[in-house]
Amino acid sequence: MKTTILILSIIVLFSSNSVLAKTINGKPRIIDGDTIHIKSNKIRLHGIDAPETKQTCKIDNEEWYCGKQSTKELKKLISNQKVKCITNDVDIYNRFVAICYVNEININQWMVENGWAIAYRYYSTDYIVEEKHARDNKLGIWKSDFMKPYAYRQQNKK
Protein backbone atom coordinates (compact mmCIF):
# COMPACT_ATOMS: atom_id res chain seq x y z
CA MET A 1 0.00 0.00 0.00
CA LYS A 2 2.79 2.43 0.91
CA THR A 3 4.55 1.64 -2.37
CA THR A 4 1.37 2.38 -4.35
CA ILE A 5 0.93 5.74 -2.61
CA LEU A 6 4.57 6.61 -3.22
CA ILE A 7 4.33 5.73 -6.92
CA LEU A 8 1.11 7.71 -7.33
CA SER A 9 2.66 10.70 -5.54
CA ILE A 10 5.66 10.62 -7.87
CA ILE A 11 3.40 10.40 -10.94
CA VAL A 12 1.33 13.38 -9.77
CA LEU A 13 4.46 15.39 -8.97
CA PHE A 14 6.05 14.83 -12.37
CA SER A 15 2.86 15.21 -14.37
CA SER A 16 1.98 18.54 -12.71
CA ASN A 17 5.50 19.91 -13.28
CA SER A 18 5.39 19.00 -16.96
CA VAL A 19 2.13 20.91 -17.38
CA LEU A 20 3.52 23.93 -15.56
CA ALA A 21 6.73 23.99 -17.59
CA LYS A 22 4.98 23.94 -20.96
CA THR A 23 6.26 26.19 -23.76
CA ILE A 24 3.64 27.59 -26.12
CA ASN A 25 4.69 29.25 -29.39
CA GLY A 26 2.70 30.98 -32.10
CA LYS A 27 0.98 34.12 -33.30
CA PRO A 28 -1.35 35.24 -30.54
CA ARG A 29 -4.79 36.76 -30.58
CA ILE A 30 -4.75 39.67 -28.13
CA ILE A 31 -7.74 39.56 -25.78
CA ASP A 32 -6.80 42.45 -23.50
CA GLY A 33 -3.71 43.95 -21.87
CA ASP A 34 -2.87 40.82 -19.89
CA THR A 35 -4.51 37.95 -21.77
CA ILE A 36 -3.66 36.32 -25.10
CA HIS A 37 -4.73 33.18 -26.94
CA ILE A 38 -2.34 31.03 -28.97
CA LYS A 39 -4.25 28.39 -30.90
CA SER A 40 -6.54 26.81 -28.28
CA ASN A 41 -4.37 27.94 -25.35
CA LYS A 42 -5.70 30.76 -23.18
CA ILE A 43 -2.78 32.54 -21.51
CA ARG A 44 -2.79 35.05 -18.64
CA LEU A 45 0.43 37.06 -18.46
CA HIS A 46 2.19 36.22 -15.19
CA GLY A 47 2.68 38.89 -12.53
CA ILE A 48 0.82 41.73 -14.23
CA ASP A 49 -2.66 43.23 -14.10
CA ALA A 50 -3.80 45.50 -16.93
CA PRO A 51 -6.88 47.73 -16.96
CA GLU A 52 -10.03 45.96 -18.10
CA THR A 53 -11.23 46.63 -21.66
CA LYS A 54 -14.13 48.84 -20.54
CA GLN A 55 -12.14 50.53 -17.78
CA THR A 56 -11.52 54.26 -17.98
CA CYS A 57 -8.89 56.47 -16.36
CA LYS A 58 -8.98 60.24 -15.79
CA ILE A 59 -6.62 63.04 -16.74
CA ASP A 60 -7.75 66.46 -15.49
CA ASN A 61 -11.28 65.08 -15.00
CA GLU A 62 -11.37 63.88 -18.63
CA GLU A 63 -12.01 60.15 -19.01
CA TRP A 64 -10.09 58.05 -21.50
CA TYR A 65 -10.32 54.34 -22.25
CA CYS A 66 -7.09 53.18 -20.65
CA GLY A 67 -8.17 49.53 -20.87
CA LYS A 68 -8.55 49.75 -24.64
CA GLN A 69 -5.26 51.63 -24.88
CA SER A 70 -3.48 48.95 -22.86
CA THR A 71 -4.75 46.34 -25.32
CA LYS A 72 -3.63 48.48 -28.28
CA GLU A 73 -0.15 48.86 -26.80
CA LEU A 74 0.16 45.09 -26.40
CA LYS A 75 -0.96 44.62 -30.01
CA LYS A 76 1.62 47.19 -31.17
CA LEU A 77 4.40 45.46 -29.23
CA ILE A 78 3.59 42.03 -30.64
CA SER A 79 2.75 43.44 -34.08
CA ASN A 80 1.58 40.15 -35.65
CA GLN A 81 4.80 38.35 -34.66
CA LYS A 82 5.15 34.94 -33.08
CA VAL A 83 5.52 34.84 -29.32
CA LYS A 84 7.01 32.27 -26.97
CA CYS A 85 5.26 31.70 -23.65
CA ILE A 86 6.70 29.66 -20.80
CA THR A 87 3.96 28.59 -18.42
CA ASN A 88 4.37 28.45 -14.66
CA ASP A 89 0.81 27.85 -13.44
CA VAL A 90 -2.82 27.36 -14.38
CA ASP A 91 -5.31 29.83 -12.91
CA ILE A 92 -8.84 29.27 -11.57
CA TYR A 93 -10.26 30.01 -15.05
CA ASN A 94 -8.13 27.18 -16.49
CA ARG A 95 -5.84 29.61 -18.33
CA PHE A 96 -2.11 29.03 -18.47
CA VAL A 97 -0.18 31.66 -16.52
CA ALA A 98 3.02 32.45 -18.39
CA ILE A 99 5.90 34.76 -19.06
CA CYS A 100 5.80 35.56 -22.77
CA TYR A 101 8.42 36.91 -25.14
CA VAL A 102 8.34 38.57 -28.54
CA ASN A 103 11.84 38.30 -29.99
CA GLU A 104 13.91 38.71 -26.80
CA ILE A 105 11.51 41.17 -25.11
CA ASN A 106 9.74 40.00 -21.95
CA ILE A 107 6.19 41.12 -22.76
CA ASN A 108 5.02 41.04 -19.14
CA GLN A 109 7.90 43.23 -18.01
CA TRP A 110 7.48 45.62 -20.96
CA MET A 111 3.78 46.17 -20.21
CA VAL A 112 4.54 47.16 -16.61
CA GLU A 113 7.69 49.15 -17.40
CA ASN A 114 5.80 51.23 -19.97
CA GLY A 115 2.84 51.80 -17.67
CA TRP A 116 0.20 49.71 -19.46
CA ALA A 117 -0.17 47.23 -16.59
CA ILE A 118 0.65 47.16 -12.89
CA ALA A 119 2.66 44.60 -10.96
CA TYR A 120 0.11 42.08 -9.65
CA ARG A 121 1.44 41.85 -6.10
CA TYR A 122 -1.27 39.45 -4.95
CA TYR A 123 0.32 36.71 -7.08
CA SER A 124 3.91 37.83 -7.59
CA THR A 125 6.66 40.18 -6.49
CA ASP A 126 7.97 40.38 -10.06
CA TYR A 127 7.87 43.71 -11.88
CA ILE A 128 7.67 45.96 -8.80
CA VAL A 129 10.81 47.85 -9.87
CA GLU A 130 9.37 48.27 -13.38
CA GLU A 131 6.11 49.59 -11.92
CA LYS A 132 8.02 52.17 -9.85
CA HIS A 133 9.83 53.30 -13.02
CA ALA A 134 6.52 53.75 -14.87
CA ARG A 135 4.88 55.51 -11.92
CA ASP A 136 7.84 57.86 -11.33
CA ASN A 137 7.96 58.77 -15.03
CA LYS A 138 4.16 59.03 -15.41
CA LEU A 139 4.08 56.48 -18.23
CA GLY A 140 0.91 54.88 -19.59
CA ILE A 141 -1.87 54.75 -17.02
CA TRP A 142 0.39 56.40 -14.43
CA LYS A 143 -0.12 59.76 -16.17
CA SER A 144 -3.72 59.61 -14.95
CA ASP A 145 -5.92 58.76 -12.01
CA PHE A 146 -7.12 55.17 -12.16
CA MET A 147 -8.62 52.39 -10.13
CA LYS A 148 -6.41 49.33 -9.76
CA PRO A 149 -7.69 46.72 -12.25
CA TYR A 150 -8.49 44.14 -9.53
CA ALA A 151 -10.53 46.76 -7.62
CA TYR A 152 -12.33 47.69 -10.85
CA ARG A 153 -13.24 44.02 -11.42
CA GLN A 154 -14.52 43.72 -7.84
CA GLN A 155 -16.66 46.83 -8.24
CA ASN A 156 -18.03 45.74 -11.62
CA LYS A 157 -18.84 42.08 -10.93
CA LYS A 158 -21.75 40.84 -12.98
Q: Which positions does each model-derived feature cover?
A:
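Small beta-barrel nucleic-acid-binding modules, primarily SNase/OB-fold domains
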Residues: 4-11, 15-158
